[in-house]
Amino acid sequence: REEMVSKVAAITKFNIDQFAYMVKKMAGLPEGDGTLLDNCIMLWGSGLEDGNRHTRQNLPFIIAGRGGGTLNTGRFLSDVSGNQGDLLTTLLSCAGVPLDRPIGIATKEISELRVAGK
């Protein structure tokens, strides 16, 4: 069991290091009045809270970028009500992607993520 946990931890570290590398690179590329990162939305996360039990509550996600000013950033959110479909629907809406139907079991947008009035 410890060996498997160690392997998963190494894979997760590699993946988050790659995500951090991309965020840093995009933050250094000028675009318009800001940076490429200011105008993008990047998502990193896991589909499982606990891989052994395959639980899907309290999923860990990191969102980078400001979505052209549509995302309310720079915070840690916990106890946000919603599901993974709600998160994806919200991010796509912030990016200006029209959806003809909800993603998965989405029922709403997550208001804590969107800049008021955007």
PLM ranges: what are they?
Residues 1-118:
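Ligand-binding pockets and gating/stacking loops
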